[in-house]
From Swiss-Prot:
GO terms for molecular function: glycine hydroxymethyltransferase activity; pyridoxal phosphate binding. PROSITE patterns: SHMT. The record marks H229 as: Plays an important role in substrate specificity. This is Serine hydroxymethyltransferase. Pathway: One-carbon metabolism; tetrahydrofolate interconversion; Amino-acid biosynthesis; glycine biosynthesis; glycine from L-serine: step 1/1. It comes from Streptococcus pneumoniae (strain ATCC BAA-255 / R6). It catalyses: (6R)-5,10-methylene-5,6,7,8-tetrahydrofolate + glycine + H2O = (6S)-5,6,7,8-tetrahydrofolate + L-serine. It is found in: Cytoplasm. The modification N6-(pyridoxal phosphate)lysine is found at K230. The keyword Amino-acid biosynthesis applies. Catalyzes the reversible interconversion of serine and glycine with tetrahydrofolate (THF) serving as the one-carbon carrier. This reaction serves as the major source of one-carbon groups required for the biosynthesis of purines, thymidylate, methionine, and other important biomolecules. Also exhibits THF-independent aldolase activity toward beta-hydroxyamino acids, producing glycine and aldehydes, via a retro-aldol mechanism. Homodimer. InterPro entries: PyrdxlP-dep_Trfase, PyrdxlP-dep_Trfase_major, PyrdxlP-dep_Trfase_small, Ser_HO-MeTrfase, Ser_HO-MeTrfase-like, Ser_HO-MeTrfase_PLP_BS, SHMT-like_dom. One of its GO terms (biological process) is tetrahydrofolate metabolic process.
Length: 418
C-alpha cells in the first residue's frame, strides 16, 4: 500500500489513537446492533485503495472524464456480481447509502406529492419509508400500514383494504425491525390489485436472500433496494436492482446526475470484493448460522416470563424484546448493557407508547457475532448475559461477572486473526 500504518501513526497520532481505540472497542465488545457486521480484510483493503483518487462521473463506457478504463472494469465487476447474486437483469452499484438508493428509487417510480404506503416505523419500518422527519415523508404523501395488534405479524387483508381505500401510486415493503418472513408475492398481488408499483427495501435481509434463506423480492418488486453492509457483510453503501430496462434507465439518471456526483469507486471496489465473498459457498453457511444464532438467543428470552419477544420469535437475523417488565425502557437497557460491553440499540415496538428516544424495546441482531465465529452455544450465553445484566442492574459484583464473561467470549473469538 502507498501509506502504511507506521506512516499514518507518525503523521497523525491523534487520529491513529482514535482509530486504535475503536478497534479495541470492537474487539472487546459483543456487537448485537442488527445493522452492523464485520467486513473482511479484503473489503477494507479495497476501500482503502488508490481508487479513492479517481473521479468517474457517469457509468462504465459513458464517463464524463478520461482515464476511467480501469474503474470501468472495477464497477462492471461489481454490477455483474450483484446481478448474479440476486438474479436481476440490472444493477446500480453507485448509491452511497441505502437512503440514497431509496431516494433514487422513489424518483424513478413516483412524483412529489404522490400517495405511498410504507411500513410504520414503530411496527418495524424505516425512516425512509415515510417518517415525517425523513425526506420521504416530506416529499411524498406517505400513509403507514402496521402489523396485527395481536399477532404482531403483517396483516395482508388489512393492507389490501387500506390500499383499496387510499389508492397509492407505490407500496413500499421491507423493514428494519421485523423478525418474520415477508411474503413479497402477496405485496405484489396487492400492488397489482390497486394499480400501484411495488418497491422493496431488503437492506436487513439481503444476505439471507442472497443465500437462499429468505424469499427474494426481486421477481416481484418493480425496484429492489438494499444496503451492502448489514447481512451482506460488505462496505457501507447502497445497491439498486430491477428487471425492467426502462426503470433501470430512470434509476441510473436518478443516481447520476440526479442526487449524486462522482461515484466512490474505492467503495464500489469494496462492494465488488464483498459480492465475490457472497458468491462463495461458505457465505451460505455463514447466513444459515446467523439465523441459528438469532433463534438461539431468542429462545432464551422466550423461556423467561419477564421478557416478551415481538411476534413470538424470529425467522431471520434479528428480533425485538419488550424489556419494560424489568427496566424502565429500552434506552435504560441499552445504557446498562453498554456498561458491560454488550452493544445493541433501543427500539420501538408495534403500537409503541413511549417516545422513540426511550422506547419499550431493544433490538438484537446476530450478524456480527456470527461473523466472529460465535455459535449457538455462545449465542445462548450472550442472551443469558443480557438477562443477567438487566435483572441485576444495581449489583456491581454481578455486573463485573458479566464483564468477565464478555471478555472471555471476545478473547476466544477475535475480530480478526493476526
Amino acid at each position: 500500500m502507498i501509506f502504511d500504518k507506521d506512516d499514518f501513526k507518525a503523521y497523525d497520532a491523534d487520529l491513529w489513537n482514535a482509530i486504535a481505540k475503536e478497534e479495541e472497542r470492537q474487539q472487546n465488545n459483543i456487537e448485537l446492533i442488527a445493522s452492523e457486521n464485520v467486513v473482511s480484510k479484503a473489503v477494507m483493503a479495497a476501500q482503502g485503495s488508490i481508487l479513492t483518487n479517481k473521479y468517474a462521473e457517469g457509468y462504465p463506457g459513458r464517463r464524463y472524464y478520461g482515464g476511467t478504463d480501469v474503474v470501468d472494469v472495477v464497477e462492471t465487476l461489481a454490477i455483474e456480481r450483484a446481478k448474479e447474486i440476486f438474479g436481476a437483469k440490472f444493477a446500480n452499484v453507485q448509491p452511497h447509502s441505502g437512503s440514497q438508493a431509496n431516494c433514487a428509487a422513489y424518483m424513478s417510480l413516483i412524483e412529489p406529492g404522490d400517495t405511498v404506503m410504507g411500513m410504520d416505523l414503530a411496527a418495524g419500518g424505516h425512516l425512509t419509508h415515510g417518517a415525517p422527519v425523513s425526506f420521504s415523508g416530506q416529499t411524498y404523501n406517505f400513509l403507514s400500514y402496521s402489523v396485527d395488534p395481536e399477532t404482531e405479524l403483517l396483516d395482508f387483508d388489512a393492507i389490501l383494504k387500506q390500499a383499496q381505500e387510499v389508492k397509492p401510486k407505490l407500496i413500499v415493503a421491507g423493514a428494519s425491525a421485523y423478525s418474520q418472513i415477508i411474503d413479497f408475492s402477496k405485496f405484489r398481488e396487492i400492488a397489482d390489485a390497486v394499480g400501484a408499483k411495488l418497491m422493496v427495501d431488503m437492506a436487513h435481509i439481503a444476505g439471507l436472500v442472497a443465500a437462499g434463506l429468505h424469499p427474494s423480492p426481486v421477481p416481484y418488486a418493480h425496484i429492489t433496494t438494499t444496503t451492502t453492509h448489514k447481512t451482506l457483510r460488505g462496505p457501507r453503501g447502497g445497491l439498486i436492482l430491477t428487471n425492467d430496462e426502462e426503470l433501470a434507465k430512470k434509476i441510473n439518471s436518478a443516481i447520476f446526475p440526479g442526487i449524486q456526483g462522482g461515484p466512490l469507486e474505492h467503495v464500489v471496489a469494496a462492494k465488488a470484493v464483498s459480492f465475490k465473498e457472497v458468491l462463495d459457498p461458505a457465505f451460505k453457511e455463514y447466513a444459515a448460522n446467523v439465523i441459528k444464532n438469532s433463534k438461539a438467543m431468542a429462545d432464551v428470552f422466550l423461556q423467561d416470563p419477564d421478557f416478551r419477544i415481538i411476534s413470538g420469535g424470529t425467522e431471520n437475523h434479528l428480533f425485538l424484546v419488550d424489556v419494560t417488565k424489568v427496566v424502565e425502557n429500552g434506552k435504560v437497557a441499552q445504557n446498562l448493557l453498554d456498561e458491560v460491553n454488550i452493544t445493541l440499540n433501543k427500539n420501538s415496538i408495534p403500537y409503541e407508547t413511549l417516545s422513540p428516544f426511550k422506547t419499550s424495546g431493544i433490538r438484537i441482531g446476530a450478524a456480527a457475532i456470527t461473523a466472529r465465529g460465535f455459535g449457538e452455544e455462545e449465542s445462548r450465553k450472550v442472551a443469558e448475559l443480557i438477562i443477567k445484566t438487566l435483572k441485576n442492574s444495581e449489583n456491581e459484583a454481578v455486573l463485573e461477572e458479566v464483564r468477565s464473561a464478555v471478555k472471555e467470549l471476545t478473547d476466544a473469538f477475535p475480530l480478526y486473526e493476526d
